[in-house]
């Protein structure tokens, strides 16, 4: 906030000793009042660099009252690089600031790869209707044998090492192996046959930890690269054991299930960094491949795979190996050449802070007048109140890289702050594109399982196999031991920066209220309609690279930053169909399905030919009509008697069991037609005579007229079963009668042969996602494992969110300027006291912070205890209320080292004034050099498990089975009553997976999640107009020199 010095312009010529000389003053002029910023002018081209040695700096001008803050101006052009000055003395230890805001949620550990759920088999083709007689409902069939479990595919080649993942949990001890070069992405080999699980071997002893090598110099930061395109998905690897359940993410839009990306290498846990402003979230890069784990003992050479054995018992756990001693710290780096000494600045006197001036109206830019004589420096004005921090300006082009300055004195590491609260769960990753599907192969005959041979070289990429039916869920394995921490991954290339939006007007700051007690959980709200996804903004241009500072030792790793999911990509085109996989193993029996609707009655079978006509018996006397008795079982048909009068239709009896079909007989000879006899009258019914012997069958007489309908007689006795008549040629189909009442369920029939695999059916549409499941009970925590030796320092983490601004304190009295003292050596650090118990956080008070105490020394790390056995995974508990904020944490690690400025003259050190209250948080300073690595802190408490994730999407229907064989033509039976629905029939064989269905409708919006983390700082506002020029500065002094007869003053 100073005036502009225009004294470098050529002055009017003045006579001296017969020649002319021109003044070229280079000192800053006195600081004028800061007017409102004018509109942003266009960036002019940089002028040519002036000549002549640098003049003495002028006296500093008065500090005028601060004007109202205008909008930020346009980014200026980068000036020439100044000479690096001497390193400043290490600053005094600052007051411990308030505890930073809750850390951003760490990315939840990737869950173990869950077995991909197989698609449901498509419904089988409807069998052709049998031409046989409609019989009783058949017995429910047995469940069909599920297909064999698909072979476990050979694992693909290891992918390249991707960008480093977020900081994982602290790993156990183990020697850190060197990072190998990234191998090329290999193609997946053909699927092998699955071997039976072998016996579980005993765990070998943990190897000794090797000595740590010297810390190498830090490499220069590479230029930011553009994110490459997402590569094609790799072949799915074998299903791993079920891992520990990670925290559940917010429910996303139900997409097609993507291939799980490999897991990044967990870096060592660093000390808590100072909470800075949150950076803009970049676009998510492609998921990196899983890095290599550290070497754990030398593995023996792999022998050929033996025949499948039975599952062995769990072996005993081996003894823990001894922790290796930490190696010596590497030698310090070579001291850099000292930079050129900067010009000394003039001693300025600090002015008193004055009140903030009101913002004046922007006046028109006046015409520039001639430069007046240089006035004497005025008395320092009152310093205005500290304004609100301005928005960060646009990044200007990078200047040329200056020479490296002298390395500063290493500061001692501060005390490690308390562990931050566990962050919220990250977003669910977007699914990857689905691979192409191949044509289904014909099912071959199952051969004997041969012995697995040695592993061959990986073949070319095969098509993705079809999804097999879901196998039985395996028993959840115990929690594996934590492996050694791998080396820190390479720093990923930064993604392109987004365009800077307009900054909102800063609102007035409200008074922070007291913390209220958490209220009871409200009722669950109804789901609102799903909102539309916002459009992705265009990517901004990549800024130029800044000059690299001197390489410092690696700093402590900060807390993991937030990984936000980018917008969902458009659904990919469905790939080609994959080749049919080996049929999967037998699945578990499914539950009995709901009863389907009653189908339409089938057509009646062809009517059989009439049997031979028997001789008519004598007519019996008409008795009283008796009540209908229960229908007995139907016996075989007897010989056909003479036709009587048509009786009333009786009620339908229960269906009898269908007997075996008789052999088809030859059609009989056609009888001759008899002569038509005279119509007789009805005679008086005589007494019943004795039954005579049956006479020979006579020829059929002509049909007489229909007689009157008689009353129904009493039920007759069941006669002896007659001989079965031959089956005649089929007659025409009769009229279908109404369906009768349902009969009792029949017995279970014999199991039919397995049908051949049918053609691929159409892909069904994807159903909507189900509601989220209920949260289970929380299980007991397992015993903590042993702490390992300090790991190597990881890359610097992202800056945390800014803390809450404190109330401005009262201004202290102005101190008298003292005489400049020599730079003192830093005093020794005190011993750190034991950490106190964590108490509840109180309300923010208006008190003044006390003076900072001395930093204690770090204690020696305790010896590691043996790791405890893993407990059984318990039921997941309900998520608790958010706890109260913890106490104020210790100051974080020093920020990055900034560019060294020219060293000024040593000012007089004033008497320390009273400590004021913490003012508003200023803009982030440049990063200082990292101090030496501190002793590793204690392992943090594990956080609560997140809520249970959403259920997976329903798989596709399976393939339709082949139509069944047509039934044989049986005799026509009477339509029986419709029986109740039998139990669910056997599942048909699973065919190859169908093509991908269309994307389902997005599910309903889930309940509101927990309040997210603090938002990032908004983009900077538009540049403001430049202010008016200040008065000219005092002459900087100089000397005369001649050039071609003219004198110049430098």
Curated annotation (Swiss-Prot):
UniProt biased composition (Basic and acidic residues): 78-92, 670-679, 936-947
Name of protein: Collagen alpha-2(I) chain
4-hydroxyproline PTM positions: 10, 13, 40, 46, 377, 380
Coiled-coil parts of chain: none
Tissue specificity remark: Expressed in bones.
Quaternary structure (record): Trimers of one alpha 2(I) and two alpha 1(I) chains. Interacts (via C-terminus) with TMEM131 (via PapD-L domain); the interaction is direct and is involved in assembly and TRAPPIII ER-to-Golgi transport complex-dependent secretion of collagen.
Provenance organism: Megatherium americanum
Compartments reported by the entry: Secreted; Secreted, Extracellular space; Secreted, Extracellular space, Extracellular matrix
Additional record remark: These protein fragments were extracted from an ancient rib bone collected at Bariloche in Argentina and estimated to be around 19050 years old.
């Amino acid at each position: 906030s100073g005036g502009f010095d225009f004294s470098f312009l050529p002055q009017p010529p003045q006579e001296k000793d017969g020649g002319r000389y021109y003044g070229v003053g280079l000192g800053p002029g006195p600081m004028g009042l800061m007017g409102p910023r004018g509109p942003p002018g266009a960036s002019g081209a940089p002028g040519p660099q002036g000549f002549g040695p640098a003049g003495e700096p002028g006296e500093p001008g008065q500090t005028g009252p601060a004007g109202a803050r205008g909008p930020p101006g346009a980014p200026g052009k980068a000036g020439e690089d100044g000479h690096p000055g001497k390193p400043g003395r290490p600053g005094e230890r600052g007051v411990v600031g308030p505890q930073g805001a809750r850390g951003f949620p760490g990315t939840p550990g990737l869950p173990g790869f869950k077995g991909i759920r197989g698609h449901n088999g498509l419904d089988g083709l409807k069998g052709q209707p049998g031409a046989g007689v409609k019989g009783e409902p058949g017995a429910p069939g047995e469940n069909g044998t599920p297909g064999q479990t698909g072979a476990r595919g050979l694992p693909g080649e290891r992918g390249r090492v991707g960008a480093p993942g977020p900081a994982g949990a602290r790993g156990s001890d183990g020697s850190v192996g060197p990072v190998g070069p990234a191998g090329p992405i290999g193609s997946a080999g053909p699927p092998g046959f699955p071997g039976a699980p072998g016996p579980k071997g005993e765990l070998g002893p943990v190897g000794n930890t090797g000595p740590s090598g010297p810390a190498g110099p830090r490499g220069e930061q590479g230029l930011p690269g553009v994110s490459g395109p997402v590569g094609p998905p790799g072949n799915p690897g074998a299903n791993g054991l079920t891992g520990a359940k990670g925290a559940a993410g917010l429910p996303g839009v139900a997409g097609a299930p993507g291939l799980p990306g490999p897991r990044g290498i967990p870096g060592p846990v660093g000390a808590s960094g100072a909470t800075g402003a949150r950076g803009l979230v970049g676009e998510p890069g492609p998921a990196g491949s899983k890095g290599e784990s550290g070497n754990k003992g030398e593995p023996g050479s792999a022998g050929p795979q033996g025949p499948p054995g039975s599952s062995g018992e769990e072996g005993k756990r081996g003894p823990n190996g001894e922790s290796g001693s930490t190696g010596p710290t590497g030698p310090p780096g070579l001291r850099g050449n000292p930079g050129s000494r900067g010009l000394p600045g003039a001693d300025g006197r600090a002015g008193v802070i004055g009140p903030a001036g009101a913002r004046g109206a922007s006046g028109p830019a006046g015409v520039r007048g001639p430069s007046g004589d240089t006035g004497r420096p005025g008395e320092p004005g009152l310093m205005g109140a500290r304004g609100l921090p301005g928005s960060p300006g646009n990044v200007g082009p990078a200047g040329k890289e200056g020479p490296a300055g002298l390395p500063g004195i290493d500061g001692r590491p501060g005390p490690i702050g308390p562990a931050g609260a566990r962050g919220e769960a990250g977003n669910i990753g977007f699914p990857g594109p689905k691979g192409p599907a191949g044509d289904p192969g014909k099912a071959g005959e199952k051969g004997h399982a041969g012995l697995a041979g040695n592993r061959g070289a990986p073949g070319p990429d095969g098509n993705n196999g079809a999804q097999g039916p879901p196998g039985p869920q395996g028993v959840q394995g115990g929690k594996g031991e934590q492996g050694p921490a791998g080396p820190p991954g390479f720093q990923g290339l930064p993604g392109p920066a987004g365009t800077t939006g307009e900054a909102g007007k800063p609102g007035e700051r409200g008074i922070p209220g007291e913390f209220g007690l958490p209220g009871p959980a409200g009722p669950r709200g109804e789901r609102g309609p799903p909102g539309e996804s916002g459009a992705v903004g265009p990517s901004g241009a990549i800024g130029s690279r800044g000059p690299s500072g001197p390489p410092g030792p690696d700093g402590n790793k900060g807390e993991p930053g937030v990984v936000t999911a980018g917008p969902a990509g458009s659904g990919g085109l469905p790939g080609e169909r994959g080749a049919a996989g080996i049929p999967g193993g037998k699945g578990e029996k499914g539950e009995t399905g709901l009863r389907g609707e009653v189908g339409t009655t089938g057509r009646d079978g062809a009517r059989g030919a009439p049997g031979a006509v028997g001789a008519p018996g004598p007519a019996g006397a008409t008795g009283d009509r008796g009540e209908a008795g229960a229908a007995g079982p139907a016996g075989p048909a007897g010989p056909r008697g003479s036709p009587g009068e048509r009786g009333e239709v009786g009620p339908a009896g229960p269906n009898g069991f269908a007997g075996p079909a008789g052999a088809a007989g030859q059609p009989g000879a056609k009888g001759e037609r008899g002569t038509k006899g005279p119509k007789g009258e009805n005679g008086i019914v005589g007494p019943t005579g004795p039954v005579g012997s049956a006479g020979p069958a006579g020829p059929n007489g002509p049909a007489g007229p229909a007689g009157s309908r008689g009353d129904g007689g009493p039920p007759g006795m069941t006669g002896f079963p007659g001989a079965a008549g031959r089956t005649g040629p089929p007659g025409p189909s009769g009229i279908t009668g109404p369906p009768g009442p349902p009969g009792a369920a029949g017995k279970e029939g014999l199991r039919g042969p397995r049908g051949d695999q049918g053609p691929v059916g159409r892909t069904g549409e994807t159903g909507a996602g189900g509601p989220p499941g209920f949260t289970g009970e929380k299980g007991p925590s397992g015993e903590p494992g042993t702490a390992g030796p300090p790991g190597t320092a990881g890359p610097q983490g992202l800056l945390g969110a800014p803390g809450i601004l404190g109330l401005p304190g009262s201004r202290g009295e102005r101190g008298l300027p003292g005489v400049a003292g020599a730079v003192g050596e830093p005093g020794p650090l005190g011993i750190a006291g034991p950490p106190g118990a964590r108490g509840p956080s109180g309300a923010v008070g208006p008190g003044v912070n006390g003076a900072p105490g001395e930093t204690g020394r770090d204690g020696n790390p305790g010896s590691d205890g043996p790791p405890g056995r893993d407990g059984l995974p318990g039921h997941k508990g309900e998520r608790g209320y958010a706890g109260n904020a913890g106490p104020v944490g210790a100051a974080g690690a020093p920020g990055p080292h900034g560019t060294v400025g020219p060293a000024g003259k040593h000012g007089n050190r004033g008497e320390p004034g009273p400590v004021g209250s913490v003012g508003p948080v200023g803009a982030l300073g440049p990063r200082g050099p990292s101090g030496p690595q501190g002793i590793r802190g204690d392992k943090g408490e594990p956080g609560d498990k997140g809520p249970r994730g959403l259920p997976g999407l329903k798989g596709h229907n399976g393939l339709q089975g082949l139509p069944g064989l047509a039934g044989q033509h049986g005799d026509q039976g009477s339509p029986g009553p419709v029986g109740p629905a039998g139990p669910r029939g056997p599942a048909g064989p699973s065919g190859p997976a169908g093509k991908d269905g269309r994307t389902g409708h997005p599910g309903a919006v889930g309940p509101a999640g927990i309040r997210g983390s603090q938002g990032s700082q908004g983009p900077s506002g538009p540049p403001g107009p430049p202010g008016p020029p200040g008065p000219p500065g005092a002459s900087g002094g100089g000397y005369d020199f001649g050039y071609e007869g003219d004198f110049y003053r430098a």
